[in-house]
Each structure stands twice: as structure tokens, then as C-alpha cells.
Swiss-Prot record:
The keyword Endoplasmic reticulum does not apply. Keywords: Cell outer membrane, Membrane, Signal. It is found in: Cell outer membrane. This is LPS-assembly protein LptD. Gene3D superfamilies: Lipopolysaccharide (LPS) transport protein A like domain. PANTHER family: LPS-ASSEMBLY PROTEIN, LPS-ASSEMBLY PROTEIN LPTD. It comes from the Bacteria. The gene is lptD. Residues 1-23 form the signal peptide. Transmembrane segments: none annotated. Disulfide bonds: none annotated. The keyword Transmembrane does not apply. Component of the lipopolysaccharide transport and assembly complex. Interacts with LptE and LptA.
Length: 723
């Protein structure tokens, strides 16, 4: 009898305390089983057989916790049966249901009336039945899935079968429809999606749109995750007015190289009855041992390709498509020296407008360039630049050009100022296939020009306070003198020289022409001053004002074909850039011809950006006898969830709209709707109107044509606010 009482007391202690049992091995290398802890209002069972817990049951094993009204645990096979308010919580998700059967060893079983929530995201779902198919593998029957918050079903996927692979963070739905506001907007027999932004092979959401040139468009991209370091996107593009085009993008990256290849191919344009294509290759390669290589190749089937079929507004304004290969070598020459060697192959595809034909640029086949510099050689700085170029052209005189430009300077510098006198000698030789000028009889020409410059400046500083902020204000006067004797160059060809835009930095350059074919004569001095406001705490430059005047002591005699100022006199330029306040920034410049006191150029822009997603831009550009344009653009929220977009580029000189954009965006908590229409003039002076409509279902898909790139290109400072 005493033995029986003792057994009953021990059994009572057993059922009143949490039970600790051993589970199956977690891994082949483990000889111990992970323990299980059970807490409940009442626990009953048989040792090594089964345990039943009733009332506020909490069962824990490792990082997995199960709560319910009633739980049966079968120790022999590690099965559990759960009834009433079942909840299974893991580190990355939570499952709810009415009835759960599950094997703790292999994580298989089923859950009735399941609900599902991802902890690391907004994904959630429910269904009629959930099958647990192993570690991190779920399969829902008659399922619904969304990323909207609880009690919000603005959009969802309704699927007969929904698989969720938590390890790969991929969902796969079969016989699925996407519903928006309970209206079916898309049906697919099969689809997969990522809820962790991982790359995966499969079809992406369809793209739909409408343009005045192509008509109604529908594209279905297929993403191919070939390897961790390269992938491809293949997109059939159906256009009601053009036919079916195939868009292809291939990307790759390695330890020493990266690049992207695009090929868009339309075998038969229904409008033109021709084959049309566009191609772009960008490749960058660190070859090692100081060598670097690059390829930039662009091509189109015809001059109207980008107007009719392009989806990048920047390309529509291009006349010459760059096609070049480049390689360079760099090494150091001791402590204060550098050596750079490079070679270049370059040509352009010119998209001619028959109404305004232009001369195609010369081909460079090839160019070899050598640059070397050695600093502080007995106080002197030596430098050398040389090149050998073969120019080619189908209609113009062409040939070889060789240049040498050695130079030496004496830099005298300290903490508050500098003086830099410099002397160089520019020598050029031409070997042409025919004389460049009818007045010349010689195909072998040369030119040698000495160049002298003297640069000097000082930096003065003082502490100041503006709007209760501490700044360092600088005053930096600068004097720059250049002397280049005149050399008659009318008989020389002009392969690549053009006059550089006049700006404040250009005041301190010896030469005013780019390229090597024209060396300007000069006897002029620049008097300039700049002032900067530098934030004392951060060291950031807040505002800069610069003004300078170039005074010419003699007439300019070397000119290009375009009208240019040749008389002695002076040019005045002033620029203001930086932040007027924390939220208002400006970039303004003005050029004044003091010979006739006329404004030659004005460039002014102001931007107001008080917060992300709030921006107002205004700009004005004027070049005498060339252009006068106004630019206005904005991105601004209104009401609670709406944003508006607008942009305009208008030519006052031609009384013509060059580009315009108008759009709206609605941002809900789990979806966004964008509508944008744009109108622009192409490089061939044709106009094009595009309409972008996109519905974005967060973390699932985008349906329609994405206007974000157009907004970024058109509205400086544009920022997405729905991320």
C-alpha cells in the first residue's frame, strides 16, 4: 500500500510540472535529441508513449513554439495532434489554424483553416488546408496571399495551389488569379514570385502601355538566373502597330570585369516593312598589371529607330551613336611620377535627318596616346603628352596626325597662395591623303607653337556666422596670364577641334579649343575672385560665388568657321552655385561681352527640396542668336496619398514645346498606381507622345509600363517615396 501511495505522489508531481522529453536526432552528427517542454493547465499521459495537454497549452522545441487549447504528443513517432486555436510560431513566420497534425522529426503534416504571416516582411495568407512538406516547405490549398496589412485586401493572389519555399524565399502559384479591389486583373496557369528580393528564374509581371508610334504594347519578360554572376532577361514585346519584337538583356560580372549587352530585334515592322534593331554593349575589364580595357558600342538599324521603338528618352535626342574600344596602361614613375599609355578605336553611327543633314565625325582608326609627368625635379615639374592618330572619312580629306607637347613649370606654393609659371611647346605634323584646303598643295604639313602661362592666387579666410550657423568664408583672388603667338592654320585640317564653352574654370585654361588641330593665339590676362562659405562643423561647402574677367591685349586671329569674337577687349563671367538655404539650391552663371555690353549667355537654375519626394525646379538658358529656353519641373505630394508630376521644356526663341510631362501617383500601404504622359521632340525634329500606366503590387509585381526612368530623366531630384 505504501508503495502504491508513493507511485501516485510521484505521478502527481509529474503531471503538475512541465514535461521534458527527448526528440529525434536533429542531424546525423548529433547523438542527443533536442528536448521538448510542455506547459498546460492539465497534463496527462504515459511515459514513452503519449502525453495529452489541455488548456493554455504551450509546447516548445528549440526555436519553435506551439500553442493551442489541446495537444496530444506521441513520443514513439514524434507526432502531435493539435485542436483549437492552434498557433505554430517560428523565427520567421507564424501559422494559425483550427486543427494541426504534424511530425516533429521531418516537419510534415497538415493544418486546417490555415492563416500565415511572414515576420520579416508583409506577406500573409490563408486557405482551406495547409500541407507541411518538410523543413521550410509549405503548400496551401485554395489559398489567398497578399502583402497588404491585416484587414486590408486591396489586392491578393487567389490560387488553387500555393507553394512557399522559405529557404529560397520563393512562392509558386498554380491556376492563380491576381485580384485588385476584388476584380480579377490577371489570370495565369502558373506563376512564381519572390518575397525576399532574391534572383530567380521565371516570368516577370507583364508590361502594358501605349505610344503614338507603336500603339498598344504588351510585354512579358522572362528572367533567366543563369549563374550567381550573370543573368539574362528575354522579353517578347507585342505592338499593335509594329508587330512582335524580342528585347534581350544579358548582364555579367566577375572579379576583374563586368558588362551589359542589349539587343532588341524586330524581324518585320508592320509600318515600314523592314527589319529593325537596336544594340548596346558596355564592357569594362581590369586586365591586370596596370592595364584596363573598355568597349562602348551602340547601333541602330535606322535613323528613326529610337523615335519609333526606343524606351529611353535620352537616346531620342542622340544624333551620333558612339562605337569605341579603349585600352590603357598606368604605372608610377618613382615617388612623384606617372606614366599612362592608351589606345583608342572610335567611330560614330550618324542618324541623319534628310531635312537637316550633318557631316559625320571622323573615324579614329586608331589613336595611341602617351602621357608622362614627373614632379619636383629640383623644384620643377615636367610633363609630356604625345599622340599618333589615324583619321578616316568617306568624303573629307583624312590621314595621320602626330602631336608632341612637352612642358615644364615652376610651382611655388604655401598654405595661403601659389605661383605657377609654365612653358610648353606644341608640335603637330599631318600626313594626309590629299590637301585639306584647295589653296594648299602639300599633303605633309606641320605646326609648332610655344605656349607660356603664369598662374597665381591667394586664399584669405575669416570666421563668420549666418543664421546661427558658423562658417569659414574665403576670399580667393586669382591672376592668370597666357601668351601664345599666332600661327597661320588655315591650310591645316580640322579633325576634332571645337571651341569650348566659356565658363569660369575655362578662364584658367591656356587653350580655348578642344582637340589638337587648332591652337589659339593669345595675349590675355584673367582677373578673378571667388568666395566660398564652408560649414565649420562639417567642412562641407555651402555656397560659392565666382567672378572673372578675361582681358585681351590683341585681336584673336585663329578662329573656327562659326562666328566668334575676334576683337581685343574683355569677357566677364560670374557664377553662383550651392545652397542659399538648407532647402534651396542654385546654379547660376552669366557671360557679358563688355565690348558691346551685351549678355552672351545666361544659365540659371534653382531647386527647392524641403523633403524627400518634394522638389520644385526652375531653369532658364540663353545663348545669343542660338537658344532661349525655360525648364520647369516638380514632384509634389497632395492630399494624403497622392503625388503630382509635371515638367516642361519650352523654347522661347522658337515658340515651341520641346518636351513636356504630366503625371499622377497614388500610394496606398501595399500598392501604387502611376499615370504619366510625356511628349518630346527627337533629334530628327519629330515628335512622340508616350503614355505610361503602371499598377505596382508591393513585393509581387508591376503591371504596366514603368515611368520611373522617364521621371528620373525629366525631373532633377525625383525620388520614389513608396519604397
Amino acid at each position: 500500500m505504501n508503495t502504491l501511495k508513493l507511485c501516485l505522489i510521484l505521478y502527481a508531481c509529474l503531471v503538475l510540472l512541465p514535461v521534458r522529453v527527448m526528440s529525434a536526432d536533429l542531424s546525423p552528427a548529433s547523438s542527443e535529441r533536442q528536448p521538448i517542454y510542455i506547459e498546460a493547465d492539465h497534463i496527462d499521459g504515459h511515459y514513452q508513449q503519449e502525453i495529452e495537454a489541455i488548456g493554455n497549452v504551450r509546447m516548445r522545441r528549440g526555436d519553435q513554439t506551439l500553442t493551442a487549447d489541446r495537444v496530444k504528443y506521441y513520443q514513439s513517432n514524434e507526432n502531435v495532434e493539435v485542436e483549437g486555436n492552434a498557433q505554430l510560431e517560428r523565427p520567421d513566420d507564424i501559422l494559425w489554424g483550427s486543427y494541426l497534425q504534424m511530425n516533429l522529426n521531418d516537419n510534415t503534416g497538415q493544418l486546417s483553416e490555415p492563416r500565415y504571416l511572414q515576420k520579416d516582411g508583409n506577406g500573409r495568407g490563408d486557405g482551406n488546408l495547409l500541407l507541411l512538406e518538410g523543413e521550410n516547405q509549405y503548400r496551401f490549398k485554395k489559398a489567398r496571399y497578399t502583402t497588404c496589412p491585416e484587414d486590408d485586401h486591396d489586392w491578393y493572389i487567389l490560387a488553387d495551389d500555393l507553394e512557399i519555399d522559405k529557404e529560397k524565399k520563393v512562392g509558386t502559384a498554380r491556376h492563380a488569379s491576381v485580384r485588385f479591389k476584388d476584380v480579377p486583373i490577371l489570370y495565369v496557369p502558373w506563376m512564381n514570385f519572390s518575397f525576399g528580393n532574391e534572383r530567380k528564374t521565371g516570368f516577370l509581371s507583364p508590361i502594358m502601355g501605349n505610344t503614338s508610334r507603336s500603339g498598344v504594347e504588351v510585354s512579358v519578360p522572362f528572367y533567366w538566373n543563369i549563374a550567381p554572376n550573370y543573368d539574362a532577361t528575354i522579353t517578347p514585346r507585342l505592338m499593335s502597330r509594329r508587330g512582335v519584337m524580342l528585347n534581350n538583356e544579358f548582364r555579367y560580372i566577375g572579379q576583374t570585369l563586368n558588362g551589359r549587352f542589349l539587343l532588341d530585334y524586330l524581324p518585320n515592322d508592320l509600318e515600314t516593312d523592314t527589319t529593325r534593331y537596336g544594340m548596346q554593349l558596355n564592357h569594362f575589364h581590369n586586365l591586370g598589371a596596370g592595364w584596363f580595357g573598355m568597349i562602348n558600342y551602340n547601333s541602330a538599324s535606322d535613323r528613326n529607330y529610337f523615335r519609333d521603338l526606343g524606351n529611353n528618352i535620352l537616346f531620342t535626342s542622340q544624333t551620333n551613336l558612339l562605337q569605341q574600344g579603349f585600352a590603357s596602361y598606368f604605372r608610377e614613375l618613382g615617388r612623384n611620377g606617372t606614366l599612362t599609355f592608351s589606345t583608342l578605336l572610335q567611330q560614330f553611327q550618324t542618324l541623319q535627318d534628310p531635312r537637316a543633314p550633318i557631316i559625320s565625325p571622323f573615324k579614329i582608326l586608331p589613336r595611341f596616346t602617351l602621357n608622362a609627368a614627373k614632379r619636383n625635379v629640383y623644384g620643377l615639374d615636367f610633363d609630356f603628352s604625345g599622340s599618333f592618330t589615324h583619321f578616316s572619312h568617306s568624303t573629307l580629306p583624312h590621314g595621320l596626325r602626330t602631336t608632341f607637347l612637352p612642358g615644364v613649370s615652376l610651382p611655388l606654393e604655401n598654405s595661403f597662395g601659389f605661383i605657377r609659371p609654365r612653358v610648353s611647346l606644341h608640335h603637330t605634323r599631318y600626313d594626309l591623303n590629299e590637301p585639306a584646303n584647295p589653296a594648299a598643295n602639300d599633303k605633309h604639313l606641320s605646326r609648332t607653337v610655344p605656349i607660356f602661362s603664369f598662374d597665381s592666387g591667394i586664399v584669405l579666410e575669416r570666421d563668420t556666422t549666418l543664421a546661427r550657423e558658423n562658417f569659414v568664408q574665403t576670399i580667393e583672388p586669382r591672376v592668370f596670364y597666357t601668351y601664345i603667338p599666332y600661327r597661320d592654320q588655315q591650310l591645316l585640317p580640322n579633325f576634332d577641334s571645337a571651341e569650348m564653352d566659356f565658363s569660369y574654370p575655362q578662364l584658367f585654361l591656356e587653350r580655348r579649343f578642344s582637340g589638337e588641330d587648332r591652337i589659339n593665339d593669345a595675349n590675355e590676362i584673367t582677373l578673378a575672385v571667388s568666395s566660398r562659405l564652408i560649414h565649420s562643423a562639417t567642412g562641407n561647402e555651402r555656397l560659392r560665388f565666382s567672378a572673372g574677367q578675361r582681358i585681351r591685349f590683341s585681336d584673336r586671329r585663329v578662329i573656327l568657321t562659326s562666328p566668334q569674337v575676334t576683337r581685343a577687349g574683355s569677357d566677364f563671367i560670374a557664377e553662383l552655385s550651392g545652397g542659399i538655404t538648407q532647402n534651396i539650391k542654385t546654379d547660376t552663371g552669366i557671360q557679358l561681352n563688355q565690348n558691346n555690353f551685351l549678355i552672351e549667355k545666361i544659365r540659371t537654375g534653382i531647386s527647392y527640396r524641403p523633403a524627400p519626394g518634394k522638389v520644385i525646379n526652375a531653369g532658364y538658358r540663353f545663348t545669343r542668336d542660338v537658344l532661349e529656353q525655360v525648364d520647369l519641373s516638380t514632384q509634389w505630394p497632395f492630399l494624403k496619398k497622392w503625388q503630382g508630376f509635371a515638367a516642361i521644356n519650352y523654347s522661347l526663341k522658337d515658340d515651341k514645346l520641346l518636351a513636356g510631362l504630366l503625371g499622377l501617383e497614388y500610394n496606398a500601404c501595399c500598392w501604387s498606381l502611376r499615370f504619366v504622359t510625356s511628349h518630346f521632340t527627337t533629334a530628327t525634329q519629330r515628335t512622340s507622345t508616350n503614355i505610361f500606366v503602371q499598377l505596382e503590387l508591393n513585393d509581387l509585381m508591376r503591371i504596366g509600363t514603368n515611368p520611373v526612368r522617364v521621371l528620373q530623366q525629366t525631373i532633377p531630384g525625383y525620388m520614389r517615396t513608396d519604397l
